């Protein structure tokens, strides 16, 4: 079954931005959280999956997303864009505040079905990437690792880069790993199929 048969992915809008759980939507719609370091391509991933150019704002300035942004998709599903982590120019106080906000959402939100953890296919995972993956495994939160910016690497080297990332993350073979490009749309179908299977 394709995502188009299940929901109209083009019928999407930003619903609200929240700093804590008192602002979360109060219903039982399933949610998919998207986490990753600043400038990993979360906004481009959201826009590509939803077939929209500017629904999620892409920015040349890392660390721009400072709240949990909830996107309503056809009144059947929500994407939750969490603040990008690991950006040095953001103060330690702000990073600590974001970390607490992200942790509160990931640990306490009953609507959460799966976290899409985005990493950059071109580079080894950072310590922040590793900590996020370990955090999700510790709390037994389902996770899909999506390696972005695949178009920046020759296709013949994808497997090598994937192996490096998996080794660094101590990747659980039962989890899903998807190589993705918002430019070529590689990984688009696999990403939707994997997300929908978790709902």
UniProtKB/Swiss-Prot annotation:
The keyword GTP-binding applies. This is Probable GTP-binding protein EngB. GTP binds at residues 36-43, 63-67, 81-84, 148-151, 180-182. The gene is engB. Its cofactor is Mg(2+). Keywords: Cell cycle, Cell division, GTP-binding, Magnesium, Metal-binding, Nucleotide-binding, Septation. Belongs to the TRAFAC class TrmE-Era-EngA-EngB-Septin-like GTPase superfamily. EngB GTPase family. The lineage of its organism: Bacteria, Bacillati, Bacillota, Bacilli, Lactobacillales. GO terms for biological process: division septum assembly.
């Amino acid at each position: 079954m394709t995502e188009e048969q299940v929901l109209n992915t083009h019928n999407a809008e930003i619903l609200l931005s929240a700093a804590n759980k008192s602002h979360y939507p109060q219903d039982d719609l399933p949610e998919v959280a998207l986490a990753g370091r600043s400038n990993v391509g979360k906004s481009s991933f959201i826009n590509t999956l939803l077939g929209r150019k500017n629904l999620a704002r892409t920015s040349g300035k890392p660390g721009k997303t400072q709240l949990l942004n909830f996107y309503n998709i056809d009144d059947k599903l929500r994407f939750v864009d969490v603040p990008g982590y690991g950006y040095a120019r953001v103060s330690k106080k702000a990073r600590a505040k974001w970390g607490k906000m992200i942790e509160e959402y990931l640990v306490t939100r009953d609507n959460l079905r799966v976290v899409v953890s985005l990493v950059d296919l071109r580079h080894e995972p950072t310590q922040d990437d590793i900590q996020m993956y370990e955090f999700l495994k510790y709390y037994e939160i389902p996770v899909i690792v999506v390696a972005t910016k695949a178009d920046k690497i020759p296709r013949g080297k994808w497997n090598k880069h994937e192996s490096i990332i998996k080794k660094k993350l101590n990747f659980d073979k039962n989890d899903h790993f998807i190589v993705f490009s918002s430019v070529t749309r590689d990984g688009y179908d696999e990403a939707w199929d994997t997300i929908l299977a978790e709902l």
